Amino acid sequence: MSFRTLSSLLPSPQNSEVSESSAFSRQSKENIKDTIILDKLRPENLPVASISDFVPLRQRDISLEAPFPSTSQINQTYVKTKAFLDSLLTKKSSLQLSSIANKDIVKREAISSVKSGTQRSVKVIEHKKDPLQPVTHRKRKVVVPSEEIQAPILHKSDDPSIKPTKEELDKWRIPSAISNWKNPNGFAISLDNRVAIESIKTDCPDNDKKDNFLLLSEALDEAEREARQRINIKQEAYKELEKEETLKKEQRLRHLAERARQDRENRRQYENEDHYVREMERNQRRRAERELERSNKMSTAEKLRRLAYQQGRDVSDKVVLNAAKATETPDLQYDSRLFKKAASSVASSSNQIFDHPLFNNSQIDNIYRPTTGSNLENEDIVDRLSNKKGRTGPVEFSAADDGKNAEQNEEDNEHAREYGLQVRKKPHTS
């Protein structure tokens, strides 16, 4: 029974040399496998594999012993491996040593002096460089030249017999560019050049193009005009819609305001009728109370003066203060006509009717023309009756007038008061 090693079952290395015998055996094996697997690609002869084919050899036969290599084979492989590794190490070490030697090269030169005749050695060492330092020399970008088609160089033919004809010269002649609209330098252009330019222009078949361009421009103008008309119509329609919407909004707001005003008036008329009546009665009572308080505070003279003013009469202070004393004339017990004759004799004029003045005493004039001596007495009487007192202390300043009357202030204070379970109502604002 012949045994094979486990390494023989493995495939050969990728870069190993293949001998003829091994190649032949491998080809034979591959052919056998191909015949087994493919068998001319017939489906009825498919390979049949069993589970025992996948079981290792050691598990198939426990008593199987693997043959170990002999000592001679081991020594031989050891020598080959060592020689190969030594060759690799020597190559690697030689490269490293050469790089180190190149780094540590020291250049020594002997310099001899002429005078002394002595020599001295100079040690030249390469300057150390930082490997991380960027490159100092400038790297220029190499520009690739553009691949332009070079103009052909036309040489004059040496053959004198070949001459261009007039037609060829006319074809190659390019007239100068002359504008019909601009001549800034003021050159005088000959008629020949003008005619040549016009002839070149007329030779070009531009009639069809011009007609087409005209049709295109007219169509574009018509389309633009129609588009503008449509836009204007849309804008007018939008404006009309906006006007209608604004009118509707205004009418709705006006209607709402009218309804609110009517509701407010109805509430004032119906809901607050009793409150309005009560307010009127309360105001009347307040006015009567204020009039009574004002009349109580007034002096007698002021009362009389006020009464006379209400009646349309003007009464002096003496009459008001009862200081005027009219002349008390006694009742005459005789007829004044008895003295008419004597009076008429004394009278300066014959037309005099009365023989003496109506009031003989002139004190009646003192009622309206008080004397200077009685002014002090009258002033004392007026001060006593009017309860006027002189100022003994500083002047009391009152609050600034807020533009409201006293009646309005009292009414506001009365509104601010709350009695019992009354609920203050906010005034309606229209």
Swiss-Prot record:
Role description: Involved in pre-mRNA splicing.
One GO biological process term: mRNA splicing, via spliceosome
Subunit architecture: Associated with the spliceosome.
Protein name: Pre-mRNA-processing protein 45
Subcellular location as annotated: Nucleus
Gene Ontology CC annotations of this record: spliceosomal complex
Entry-linked InterPro entries: SKI-int_prot_SKIP, SKI-int_prot_SKIP_SNW-dom
Residues covered by region (Disordered): 1-28, 280-299, 370-430
Pfam families: SKIP_SNW
Major location category of this protein: nucleus
Keyword tags: mRNA processing, mRNA splicing, Nucleus, Spliceosome
Bias (Polar residues): 1-26
Entry keyword Signal: no
Family under the similarity heading: Belongs to the SNW family.
Highest taxon of source: Eukaryota
Coiled-coil segments on the chain, per record: none
